[in-house]
Regions:
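Phosphate- and other anionic-substrate recognition elements at nucleic-acid/protein interfaces
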Residues: 1-159
Length: 159
């Protein structure tokens, strides 16, 4: 039986990320992106055109953040709703997973550098740089990649 699945991880927010893991029988294609609304729409359109019912997405379940202003909270909630709306509109199944759950699976805490190191260990050939000109790796891209891997393991029954 051929195994063809796509796993999408989304770390919402201004410095968030998107990651796609495509299992193509014996090969695997992995891509990461800094988060943007346009990138999300483009990826979802591409995936639904080619993959239909073989997509699983994990979106980090977020709540209000202490000491965040009213406007910031509203804008973040609006962006979060946008992500869920795009997924729903494209009929992409998703699960909201708390950061504690997926981070516990990878033995991580709130240290963003540990997320980057774990992503680099699991996917050494994948760039976590938002652009070619950046020198600092993106923790949002690293965490979205770990969420996509969490989705892959969840789908495979290893969690």
């Amino acid at each position: 039986m051929n195994k063809r699945m796509v796993y999408l991880g989304i770390d919402p927010g201004k410095k968030g990320g998107l990651a796609v893991i495509k299992d193509l029988n014996e090969e695997r294609e992995v891509r990461t992106y800094p988060y943007s609304d346009d990138t999300l729409k483009k990826i979802c359109k591409e995936l639904t055109a080619d993959w239909k019912n073989v997509i699983l997405c994990v979106v980090e379940k977020v709540g209000a953040m202490p000491k965040q202003g009213v406007t910031s909270t509203f804008n973040f909630g609006k962006g979060y709703g946008y992500i869920l709306g795009v997924l729903e509109a494209n009929c992409i199944p998703y699960q909201l997973i708390s950061p504690q759950r997926w981070k516990k699976h990878f033995s991580l805490d709130n240290d963003k550098n540990k997320s980057i190191q774990t992503a680099k260990r699991l996917f050494p050939s994948v760039s976590l740089l938002p652009t070619d000109r950046c020198r600092v790796e993106s923790d949002g891209m690293a965490e979205s990649l770990l969420m996509a891997e969490f989705a892959r393991r969840l789908s495979g029954g290893t969690i």
